[in-house]
């Protein structure tokens, strides 16, 4: 977990409370922030300063600065509760964004009249670097620039240039002007982050006079270097993910506003930043008590919500919770339940002895799956393990299946196009595995036991309206394989683990007509098996006949 070192005097000043070592060691862990150590260090003036090192959970990037940490602690201790709203003043400052392929997303904001000193400057630099890691993935996803606004002139332009198109003095080289290409070849930061520059295109931010503020994600210019005497700060965030860029900007401007800074909007190609509008979620009172094992009334829940820096009102059995813009960790209602638990007080939870003494044992479904695995291995199959994430092409198109979007769950922000859908079936992934292993000798007999995820509109237990289903699937390929071979293996499995099953003829687009059967148990379809259609075999770029089965375990 990332750690931050905080000056104790500065923390007390921002928290509006005197903090003994005991209070720090007792109370901060109860709000989810671990205290690593309390120590002394000598500052630049030779004076001893008491410092506190905290470990911050990655899901709370707003705690990566003393300002955000103090804001959270004030609420936790009940000093200031509810949403702390930050006013954003309008301005005519504009940023012109030209086409930028490398880092297409950009957001700006101005914070005026910041009460700057050595503490603030150090905290700001540390926050910038911690966010580069926590959200920016070491500047790959986003990069942050903070500038002395008084040294430049609006409007600003964000564009891409060639490596030798311009010269400026980068931070660390106080007098030597360098081109972007020279920076990535000679400058320490340039060498470190040169891999983030693509196709000899260098993102650059310049002011109305053509002066360079920054070459993101590499280095800022010396011209706008922030010092303890700077008071008006211009923040730029550039990156590859729009939501991350905007959320990071919100965290930084709200931290600087804790230093009595005034947030001023900046027009970026017609859109005003920052956007500090509140988010909203609805959560049932009953679900909160059920999850926490408590019997809190709505008033107690609202009090806990307000201590977490949010607001709430009660309406028809639900809490309507208002969430500030810097809280990017509230992704699901379970996060709200955690906030209520933290601010109600973990120390108030009472342990209860179970009424019946029991001993631990394996889950019955897992025991059944392990036994199935042993049987399949005994039948000569090799077990494989695929990812639960797949894609529409593998799951549906190659299997000749026609489905609508409502029939599967798609990942909102997939890491790759190959992993953007939660699988609804295992058999297509086995065919993909056979393709990967087509250079190996035949026969090949493989199986997998794992979870598939399906939509369940009748689900009342979760907010996601989906559930995991445990399935087993197998596939065989060699030149002479046929329906009888897969029927024999499937029957062996069914006789051992399923009772009173029967087969019926089944027309399935992925199988040869007349050579596919569905498995019926208690009047319900629980699986199917048969010979894979030649068209499907060719879709997976395979060459030999394939037979397969798939059965729902639970």
UniProtKB/Swiss-Prot annotation:
One record GO biological process: phenylalanyl-tRNA aminoacylation
Read off the HAMAP family from this record: Phe_tRNA_synth_beta2 (MF_00284)
Which PROSITE patterns does the record cross-reference, listed alphabetically? B5
For molecular function, the Gene Ontology terms on record are: ATP binding; magnesium ion binding; phenylalanine-tRNA ligase activity; RNA binding
Source species of the chain: Methanococcus maripaludis (strain C5 / ATCC BAA-1333)
The subcellular location is: Cytoplasm
Oligomeric and partner information: Tetramer of two alpha and two beta subunits.
* EC number(s) recorded for this UniProt protein: 6.1.1.20
Q: Which cofactor does it need?
A: Mg(2+)
Name of protein: Phenylalanine--tRNA ligase beta subunit
Q: Quote the NCBIfam families the UniProt record gives.
A: pheT_arch
> Gene3D superfamilies annotated for this entry?
3.30.56.10, Bira Bifunctional Protein, Domain 2, Phenylalanyl-trna Synthetase, Chain B, domain 3
Annotated PANTHER family: PHENYLALANINE--TRNA LIGASE BETA SUBUNIT, PHENYLALANYL-TRNA SYNTHETASE BETA CHAIN AND LEUCINE-RICH REPEAT-CONTAINING PROTEIN 47
Main localization of the protein described in the UniProt heading: cytoplasm
Binding residues for Mg(2+), per the UniProt record?
A: 329, 335, 338-339
Family to which this protein belongs: Belongs to the phenylalanyl-tRNA synthetase beta subunit family. Type 2 subfamily.
- Top EC class of this enzyme: ligase
Catalysed conversion reaction: tRNA(Phe) + L-phenylalanine + ATP = L-phenylalanyl-tRNA(Phe) + AMP + diphosphate + H(+)
